[in-house]
Amino acid sequence: MDGILNIFKPIGLTSFDVVRQVKKISKEKKVGHTGTLDPLASGVLPICIGKATKIVDFVMEGKKIYDAEMKLGEISDTYDREGKILKVNQVTSSENNIVEAIMSFQGEILQVPPMYSALKVNGIKLYDLARQGIEIERASRKIHIYAIKILSIDIPFVKFRVECSKGTYIRSLCYDIGNKLGCGALMYNLTRVSSGNFNSSFSIPLEDLNEQNITENIINVDKCLENYDEIAVDEKFEKLLVNGVKVSDRRLIEKIPDNKTYRVYNMERKFLGLGNLSEEGFKIIKLLT
């Protein structure tokens, strides 16, 4: 069984809980998720099975869309409502000031990840240090907030939709917005609406997945990579490429316009994998045949 499941994760489970359940249902050993969702969060969690686990990094590259609910006036150690409340402040900002502060985070920004995260420093996960009461300085990371839409404001609660790059922490975004307003804030609820090509409208709730319907819900690997252009290669080049040879023959190179990643098919429309063109030639970088 090779492909990707568009799972809708319920609140209360970790991403690895979902992986374990899919392993049990599919009876497959190779199963992996494509981007952690906190237990507090629900939403789209693409799960790769079999050979699809080879392309986890490529699936994770896509933009993410979240529906977030933020509570102003409270600060917690985890940046969400499940953590220890460290401070409570009065919210004095007007709705206009709140909107202005939120919208100022659009564009390319630097974000410091929360201590309670799976990021590693010197091989140790940050949340393992945080649980020991250790806080260390974290380097800021460049992220992109493509769009923010305010859904509702009922002070101290604010609901908004965020379209962002991978690696964005909505908990940190809420914390930073609260910091800018001077009252603090924490993430109260979160739903991932989409992740790359995967949307909640076409997802299957984890609790509905079973041995009978898993096959009909699995998506072919190449269909999940439709954001990459495709090329077809003839039999001669196919044999070279699947054996790891970097092909510099101009009869192939001239068919490939740009130095970027492509979906590669043979002439019978069999998906071979992902290939990349460089100055030295064209090569399969992820073989999936």
Swiss-Prot record:
Presence of the UniProt keyword Iron-sulfur in the record: no
Keyword tRNA processing: yes
A Pfam family per the record: TruB_N
Keywords: Isomerase, tRNA processing
Active site: D38 (nucleophile)
Record-level GO BP terms: mRNA pseudouridine synthesis; tRNA pseudouridine synthesis
InterPro entries registered for this protein in UniProt: PsdUridine_synth_cat_dom_sf, PsdUridine_synth_N, tRNA_psdUridine_synth_TruB, TruB_C
Any GO MF annotation of the entry: tRNA pseudouridine(55) synthase activity
UniProt-listed Enzyme Commission number(s): 5.4.99.25
Catalytic activity: uridine(55) in tRNA = pseudouridine(55) in tRNA
Family statement drawn from the similarity comment of this UniProt entry: Belongs to the pseudouridine synthase TruB family. Type 1 subfamily.
Reported function: Responsible for synthesis of pseudouridine from uracil-55 in the psi GC loop of transfer RNAs.
PANTHER family: PSEUDOURIDYLATE SYNTHASE TRUB1 (PTHR13767:SF2), TRNA-PSEUDOURIDINE SYNTHASE (PTHR13767)
Name of the molecule in the record: tRNA pseudouridine synthase B
Organism expressing this protein natively: Clostridium acetobutylicum (strain ATCC 824 / DSM 792 / JCM 1419 / IAM 19013 / LMG 5710 / NBRC 13948 / NRRL B-527 / VKM B-1787 / 2291 / W)
